[in-house]
UniProtKB/Swiss-Prot annotation:
The lineage of its organism: Bacteria, Pseudomonadati, Pseudomonadota, Gammaproteobacteria, Enterobacterales. InterPro entries: Aldolase_TIM (IPR013785), GatZ/KbaZ-like (IPR012062), GatZ_KbaZ_carbometab (IPR050303), TagBP_ald_KbaZ (IPR023435). One of its GO terms (biological process) is carbohydrate metabolic process. GO terms for cellular component: plasma membrane. PANTHER family: D-TAGATOSE-1,6-BISPHOSPHATE ALDOLASE SUBUNIT KBAZ (PTHR32502:SF2), N-ACETYLGALACTOSAMINE PERMEASE II COMPONENT-RELATED (PTHR32502). This is D-tagatose-1,6-bisphosphate aldolase subunit KbaZ. NCBIfam families: agaZ_gatZ, PRK15458.1. Signal peptide: none annotated. It comes from the Bacteria. Component of the tagatose-1,6-bisphosphate aldolase KbaYZ that is required for full activity and stability of the Y subunit. Could have a chaperone-like function for the proper and stable folding of KbaY. When expressed alone, KbaZ does not show any aldolase activity. Belongs to the GatZ/KbaZ family. KbaZ subfamily. Pathway: Carbohydrate metabolism; D-tagatose 6-phosphate degradation; D-glyceraldehyde 3-phosphate and glycerone phosphate from D-tagatose 6-phosphate: step 2/2. Gene3D superfamilies: Aldolase class I, putative tagatose 6-phosphate kinase domain like. Forms a complex with KbaY.
């Protein structure tokens, strides 16, 4: 994918540019992202994780081919050029099968890689850092790298078989915290040391050589590291550049490599920009986008309660709460404390476990009901000012139509705008 190698080349030349990766499968989030990229005439990187999308369907029920079809159909409907769309696979490896013996988990990981590459995903994050059922804890760098090299070989062969040539770009390594936000309350976070980053790179370089893959090293464009950013349910650990100086300087010695930062959600615009300047030039964002979606929906539900008789309301928030209580598997092991603390977390936690529930048919019906109720007649401006003040300013200036859907999309785009600005470069 020329967009990514070109971005890395420009960054290495001192342009201080980057790219953000939208990590969400929600149609409204994806529509917001596609429309934003279209308006700003930039490429768009959309990523699926190994939890969301796999050869068996993942938690979204989509295979990689399904996900690609879904995104491309949406892009076509919005007249977004497919050659400006980059699809990535995140944390691809034995992640989903850690409860199985390593041989079985890695066989599944081989098939996972094949399914992503055959579907046309071009940015591949190889992550074999997790221990399987019969593995030591933690794994050595050498075992992690050997497994990643095995998957890279599968990826290269699959790409040549389906597309005639291998043009994949790879990301290696992993951040220390679990994907998708920390489970526990945070206070301090260890930044990856330069020595650890170098050890990961050298182990991978050696493992790739052993597999006869030395030639693809320039296509390994990024190493995932922990620059010292994370969030839990109610707190954000902000980027502190001074703590990451040595790590930032270390990557300057590698001609074709930058860093990828995960869990950048909820960082300030200033921190996002500084991350990119410091060579953490691929910024992953996911929960912050569905958090913004949830904020907009809760605001619209509050407006609905002001305008619509109680018996005709969608009851979106109550429906959501009921479904989350009936099916607690996506939040129960994450949210702790008494009943009130867990209730607040279900609705408002930064980790946004509510994102797993939007596809539910009852919740989707309530959402459609809410939009119908508010689309029948214009939403009074004072209520938009009360509940969506940033959108109110744009409505008043004529930039934004005050329809439920446009208000939601625009609220999500406020977050995307922060990432776009951080990645623009000079």
């Amino acid at each position: 994918m020329k967009h990514l190698t070109e971005m890395v080349r420009q960054h290495k030349e001192g342009k201080t540019n980057g790219i953000y990766a939208v990590c969400s499968a929600h149609p409204l989030v994806l529509e917001a992202a596609i429309r934003y990229a279209s308006a700003n005439q930039t490429p768009l990187l959309i990523e699926a994780t190994s939890n969301q999308v796999d050869q068996f369907g993942g938690y979204t029920g989509m295979t990689p081919a399904d996900f690609r079809g879904f995104v491309c159909q949406l892009a076509d409907s919005l007249n977004f050029p497919q050659d400006a769309l980059i699809l990535g696979g995140d944390h691809l490896g034995p992640n989903r099968w850690q409860n199985l013996p390593a041989a079985q988990a890695m066989a599944n990981a081989d098939d996972l890689i094949k399914s992503y590459v055959a579907a046309g995903f071009k940015k591949i994050h190889l992550d074999c850092s997790m221990s399987c059922q019969d593995d030591p804890i933690p794994l050595t760098d050498d075992i992690v790298a050997e497994r990643a090299a095995r998957l890279a070989k599968v990826a290269e062969e699959t790409c040549r078989e389906h597309f005639g040539a291998a043009d994949l770009e790879y990301v290696i390594g992993t951040e220390v915290p679990v994907p998708g936000g920390a489970h526990e309350t945070l206070s301090e976070l260890a930044v990856t040391t330069p020595d650890a980053a170098r050890a990961t790179l050298e182990a991978h370089r050696h493992a790739f050589e052993k597999q006869g893959l030395s030639a693809i090293w320039p296509r390994i464009i990024a190493l995932v590291v922990q620059p010292g950013v994370e969030f839990d349910h109610t707190n954000v650990i902000d980027y502190q550049p001074a703590k990451a100086t040595a790590l930032s300087q270390m990557v300057e010695n590698y001609e074709t490599l930058i860093f990828e930062a995960h869990s950048t959600d909820y960082q300030t615009p200033q921190s996002l920009r500084q991350l990119v300047i410091d060579h953490f030039a691929i910024l992953k964002v996911g929960p912050a986008l569905t958090f913004a979606l949830r904020e907009a929906l809760f605001s619209l539900a509050a407006i609905e309660e002001e305008l619509v008789p109680a018996k005709a309301c969608s009851g979106l928030r109550q429906v959501l709460e009921n479904v989350m209580l009936d099916r607690p598997e996506y939040w129960q092991s994450h949210y702790h404390g008494d009943g009130n603390a867990r209730r607040l977390a279900r609705g408002y936690s930064y980790s946004d476990r509510v994102r797993y529930y939007w596809p539910d048919s009852q919740i989707d019906d309530a959402f459609a009901h809410l939009v119908r109720n508010l689309a029948d007649s214009p939403i009074p401006l004072p209520l938009i000012s009360q509940y969506l003040p940033l959108q109110y300013v744009k409505v008043r200036s004529g930039e934004l139509q005050p329809t439920p859907r446009e208000l939601i999309i625009n609220h999500i785009q406020d977050i995307l705008a922060q990432y776009h600005t951080a990645c623009e470069g000079q």
